């Protein structure tokens, strides 16, 4: 086996006259490794923060021995208020990361945060959003990502040296002596997956990205087995990952089993082998084995990866970026989702994130509506509360931590209306919403839309049974708005009106109406109500948006995109709570006349007229400086009848993108032009 040495010369990123000031928050073992290599960076340690001033002072004294003079030792808040600090390295226990990251960003500091960025994806989303809103770097400290060995590995994959990549094997596991300390404590998010499992996961993702050219790779399938020890954490686990395009990976981690801790990349023409790529000792190597060449070894001696990750963070700060190219925010979010799935596959959920947990805001502060938020508001007679014009759909949030993060963001941006249904998630999502409302103590500040009586249980008896069960799940005694999820024309409409009116008079419902009801049936219900002294239907929730619907996604749905329905809504002034106002992605850019891969999209929306609407939405979007999706939402908001469109963002980033439509005020002429009525 021949050996060759790679060129590992690095260029300093800053001068002594412009030397970024670093603070360490959480001066433990890994912080000392960071400190030991910081002299090789362009920065200098100026402060150490800890919950224990004694620990902070000990760390400052150690820094002085490395040549860092005048290092202050103080509390976290005092360190973040220090004007000498440009960037912070967060290295507390996993559960301490989030609040310190948020506090640092609010203080105007760049952040290098030890892995994992957060214990779960919901919390990680909030941190990513905070960095993007602040315009400051947030970098997850997977140290190996910043080492020349990793860059060389990805170049070898990208250049096709081993042909097409087929499989990746990566492991990081070690055996500790006793089941004590943070690694075995569920309250500090202990266990292998969160401590070191992110290393093989992020390595596999980086290799897939290099092999396929995508910016972020996330497994489409994940299966896993593992062992939960007596303290409740994962002590040993193996996961099998499959990526889009067919590349597979086997990843292993643990805190009570020693593994080889290596990476192997297999391709159609050979393989690449890395021994212990995580701790990055004095001379890490890559072995290159190909079918038509002698094996060779690349050597990467004399590097300081902790210094490199520090410089990458401050380089991003100077450039006005919110991330480092070596480990982007979107990669960190994909990693958090993957680790969530891995833990779920082996049945590991920490007590602080359980469905029954009192999960606080990520900052730990009380939830409040932010000043200068973009929300518009309206009224629906009988509700007794002001309603945000956007309605958060509660039909997709995978766990309480995720739901809490995205619901908190919605409220901070002025939102207060939530739409859920008896059938969503088998009832789990109603309970999830109710628990979040209970945790925040805001039942009288929010409007909850409850739906029930979906086919095949669309009858008065089932309506009552489901309503009572929905209220119990939500932990409340009333629904602000109740809507029948479907209609059943085989049952006289008066029977539905009678039972709904009964529940309203009993105080269980404040306002009621129908989802997926025809205008004719709606009118019939109200004619019966007037004739019999009952409360009328007051709200309708049908599909409505800029794109005209030629069919509906599911059986029993009704749309209101045709001219007759629009005229009826304008005449009656019935508040409409439209679902799928974005036409299931028609305005996102993925719909083109040539692309017929999505049969449902084609069936429901493809026509020359709708593609002309899309063209006009883009043209108007260019004028307003917003995407076509924002124009599509603005079209719904600017109708001559009251509208409260539902949206179901899967992430905080999607929620913010959707809300850009709130800033667009269309004239009646622009609304007509978009709808081809000019």
PLM segments and residue spans:
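Predominantly a Rossmann-like dinucleotide-binding segment in NAD(P)-dependent oxidoreductases
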Residues: 146-222, 229
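Beta/alpha (TIM)-barrel catalytic core signal, keyed to glycine-rich beta->alpha loops juxtaposed to Asp/Glu
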Residues: 239, 487, 491-678
């Amino acid at each position: 086996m021949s050996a060759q040495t790679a060129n590992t010369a690095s260029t300093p990123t800053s001068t002594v006259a412009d030397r970024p000031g670093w603070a360490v928050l959480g001066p433990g073992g890994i912080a000392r490794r960071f400190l030991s290599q910081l002299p090789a960076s362009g920065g200098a340690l100026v402060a150490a923060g800890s919950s224990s001033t004694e620990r902070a002072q000990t760390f400052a004294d150690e820094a002085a021995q490395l040549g860092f003079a005048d290092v202050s030792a103080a509390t976290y808040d005092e360190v973040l208020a220090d004007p000498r600090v440009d960037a912070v390295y967060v290295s507390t226990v996993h559960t301490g990361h989030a609040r310190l990251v948020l506090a640092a960003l609010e203080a105007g500091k760049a952040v290098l945060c030890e892995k994992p960025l957060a214990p779960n994806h919901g919390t990680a989303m909030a941190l990513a959003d905070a960095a993007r809103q602040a315009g400051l770097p947030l970098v997850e400290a997977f140290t190996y990502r910043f080492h020349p060995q990793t860059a060389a590995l990805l170049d070898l994959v990208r250049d096709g040296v081993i042909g097409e990549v087929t499989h990746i094997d990566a492991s990081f596991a070690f055996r500790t002596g006793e089941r004590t300390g943070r690694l075995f404590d569920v309250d500090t998010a202990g266990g292998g997956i969160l401590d070191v499992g992110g290393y093989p996961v992020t390595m596999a993702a980086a290799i897939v990205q290099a092999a396929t050219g995508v910016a972020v790779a996330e497994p489409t399938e994940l299966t896993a087995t593992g062992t939960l020890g007596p303290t409740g954490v994962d002590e040993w686990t193996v996961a099998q990952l499959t990526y889009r395009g067919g590349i597979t990976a086997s990843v292993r981690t643990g805190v009570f089993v020693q593994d080889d801790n290596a990476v192997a990349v297999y391709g159609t023409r050979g393989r690449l082998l890395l021994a212990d790529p995580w701790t990055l000792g004095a001379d890490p190597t890559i072995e290159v084995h190909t079918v038509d060449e002698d094996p060779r070894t690349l050597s990467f001696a004399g590097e300081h990866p902790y210094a490199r990750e520090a410089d990458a963070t401050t380089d991003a700060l100077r450039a006005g970026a919110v991330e480092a190219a070596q480990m982007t925010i979107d990669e960190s979010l994909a990693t958090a989702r993957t680790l969530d799935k891995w833990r779920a596959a082996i049945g590991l959920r920490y007590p602080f994130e359980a469905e029954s947990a009192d999960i606080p805001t990520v900052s730990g502060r009380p939830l409040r509506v932010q000043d200068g938020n973009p929300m518009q508001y309206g009224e629906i007679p009988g509700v007794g509360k002001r309603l945000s014009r956007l309605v958060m759909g509660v039909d997709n949030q995978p766990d309480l931590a995720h739901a809490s993060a995205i619901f908190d963001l919605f409220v901070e941006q002025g939102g207060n209306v939530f739409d859920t249904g008896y059938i969503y998630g088998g009832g789990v999502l109603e309970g999830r919403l109710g628990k979040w409302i209970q945790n925040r103590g805001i039942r009288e500040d929010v409007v909850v839309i409850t739906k029930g009586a979906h086919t095949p249980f669309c009858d008065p008896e089932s309506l009552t049974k489901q309503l009572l069960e929905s209220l119990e799940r939500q932990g409340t005694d009333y629904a602000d708005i109740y809507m029948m999820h479907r209609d059943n024309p085989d049952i006289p409409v008066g029977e539905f009106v009678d039972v709904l009116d009964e529940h309203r008079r009993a105080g269980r419902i404040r306002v009621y109406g129908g989802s997926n009801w025809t205008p004719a049936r709606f009118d019939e219900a109200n004619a019966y109500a007037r004739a019999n002294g009952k409360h009328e239907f007051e709200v309708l929730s049908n599909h409505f948006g800029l794109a005209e619907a030629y069919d509906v996604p599911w059986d029993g749905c009704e749309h209101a995109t045709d001219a007759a329905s629009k005229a009826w809504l304008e005449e009656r002034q019935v508040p409409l709570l439209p679902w799928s106002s974005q036409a299931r992605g028609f305005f996102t850019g993925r719909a083109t006349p040539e692309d017929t891969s999505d049969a449902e999209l084609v069936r429901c929306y493809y026509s020359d007229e709708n593609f002309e609407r899309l063209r006009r939405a883009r043209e108007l979007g260019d004028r307003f400086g917003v995407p076509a999706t924002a124009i599509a939402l603005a079209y719904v908001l600017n109708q001559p009848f009251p509208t409260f469109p539902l949206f179901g963002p899967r992430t905080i980033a999607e929620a913010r993108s959707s809300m850009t439509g709130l800033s667009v005020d269309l004239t009646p002429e622009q609304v007509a032009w978009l709808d081809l009525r000019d």
